[in-house]
C-alpha cells in the first residue's frame, strides 16, 4: 500500500469527503485546508490572504507586485510555502493530501498514489447546491467558475516549476 495518497478533484465531485473518509478508514492524517493554516503560520500571511492569492494566481501582475515582500510575487511565495509544507508532511509519514497540486508537488515521491475524483456536471451541480447551499440560479456558474480557477491554479503551478 502507498504511504502517501494525493487526491485532486473537481468542484462538487465529493472528492474532499471521499479523501476524509479514506484517511479515517486507513487511520492516517488528512490534510486539506490545514495546509493553508500551516503555510499561513510559516509565512506570516493570513489564511484569508493565502486563499485570495490562490484565486488570483493567474491574474494581476500589479496585485502580485504590490503585496510582494521578498522580490517574488506573492503567488510564488504562497506556492513555495504550500509546496514546502506538502513535502514536509509527506516526509513525516503516511497521509492523505487533498488539492494544492500535491500530486504534482510530490511527482517524484515514491510510494505515492495520485487520484483524481471527477463526476458528471449534473451531479456536481446537485451536490454543490445541496452541500454548499448555492442558490439554484447561481450553482452552475459557480461550479464552472471553480473548475476554471482550479485549472488555472494547476497550470500556474506547472508553469512555475517548468524550466525556462
What positions do the PLM features span?
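ATP-dependent small-molecule kinase phosphotransfer cores
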Residues: 40-94
